[in-house]
Curated annotation (Swiss-Prot):
GO molecular function: DNA binding; identical protein binding
The protein's name: Transition state regulatory protein AbrB
Protein family: To B.subtilis Abh and SpoVT.
Organism: Bacillus subtilis (strain 168)
Domain annotation SpoVT-AbrB: ranges: 7-52
């Protein structure tokens, strides 16, 4: 993952809060009361605007590239779809 430095440094307050500057929130389309997901990658903390509908129901992968199927009731990543296809094929083989 490529990360671009903003040059912005913020201190954590006594309650563990960090303020995201308004310029950065505007640039990233983060409004007041928006939910953010928190990820950890090695020693990095990654904040991402929460998109509840794009989480793969098999792998847990969150991506805008995930597939929405069955009228939006099922969300799958490429890997999740491959796992489901493989399991269905195995089940169908066992029925024969």
């Amino acid at each position: 993952m490529f990360m671009k430095s903003t040059g912005i440094v913020r201190k954590v307050d006594e309650l563990g809060r960090v303020v995201i500057p308004i310029e950065l929130r505007r640039t990233l389309g983060i409004a007041e009361k928006d939910a953010l997901e928190i990820y950890v990658d090695d020693e990095k903390i990654i904040l991402k605007k929460y998109k509840p509908n794009m989480t793969c129901q098999v792998t847990g992968e969150v991506s805008d590239d995930n597939l929405k199927l069955a009228g939006g009731k099922l969300v799958l990543s490429k890997e999740g779809a491959e796992q489901i296809i493989s399991e269905i094929q195995n089940q169908l083989q066992n029925l024969k």
